Amino acid sequence: NLFNGEYYEHEVRTPRRTRDMAPSLRLHMGAAKVMQPDYQLGNGCLVDQLVGQFMAHVCGLGYLVKPSHVRRTLRSITKYNRRDGFIDHFNCMRSYAMGDESALLLASYPRGRPDNPFPYFTEVMTGFEYTAAIGMLYEGQDAAGLRAIDDIRSRYDGAKRSPFDEA
């Protein structure tokens, strides 16, 4: 079970022996240390960890996991990934939210960050935010879901950024 009581974690499973891994998989993105790979989400709280549940709802398939876990996970995403203001937010990647804007980060590490974490965790991307927001709306977390959507619309209001080119 990957649910830690607040959200679903990414369990990093390494091969028993390096030679058990295809050579082509050992070339890039943290694969130099196969038994301790870099750039993994690990115990991070990922904004779109429930994308499968979102699609299951859209398709009328019902719940894939315990409904209480879904609701708790979405509350955790709001708690840990929501950021109001990016003035003091370090992001060495692409910045799709700046200044006094608000957004949901791709990932957060409330239980401790690995030395070399998932490289995009400090970024914001609307597609992932919408997935979380719609999940919140499906689960009756209307205020949080609508706030996430309002944050996006505020960033892409036609003055600061094009409303036809959300990143």
Annotate the PLM regions:
Residues 167:
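Catalytic cores of secreted or luminal carbohydrate-active enzymes
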Residues 53, 57-63, 129-142:
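Alpha-helical support elements that line or immediately flank enzyme active sites
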